[in-house]
Amino acid sequence: MAYQNFNMDHQWLPFTPNRSFAKDPRIFVAADGMHFTTHDGKQVLDAISSLWCVGAGHNRKPINEAIKKQLDTLDYATAFQASNDKAFRAAEMIAAMAPGDLNKVLFCNSGSEAADTSMKVALAYHRARGEGHRNVFIGREKGYHGVGFGGMSVGGIQIGRASCRERVLVQV
């Protein structure tokens, strides 16, 4: 289905009934502060900070400038057998704020990756302690933990969970 100046047939939206969406789409074309602007000029409050990814708001000038400055210096560096100075500084700052002896930081690219990685870390931790039998996860009804297999397996949103839960994590 063509919509405005683009074709909506090629993007698959997670946790979204895509055919229904195509009939009455919500298309955002801009964002500033706490609001989106739709293709037809309406303002929409982003009450969930775009799934908690923009807690400081959209299009914040100081954040935009810091990102641009960093992009001009180093856009990305893998954490596989290498790292970068900013990652070490950020890890140190986060560790200083964490309670007790929680002083290790593993950076992930998204909440979905963080959910899946935390599950792998929990399984590895118990296995290393000789308690590999501790492999049951508890999820919340209607809980959202991302679009990765682990997050969907422990999540409670039925539209996504049904397709992978029994194949990936049986004991949820």
What would you call each of these model-derived segments?
Residues P14-F15, R19, A47-K61:
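Glycine-rich phosphate/pyrophosphate-binding beta-alpha loops
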Residues I27-T37, C53-K69, F80-E92:
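A structural motif shared across PLP-dependent enzymes of the aminotransferase-like
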Residues L169-V172:
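Cysteine-centered metal-binding/redox modules
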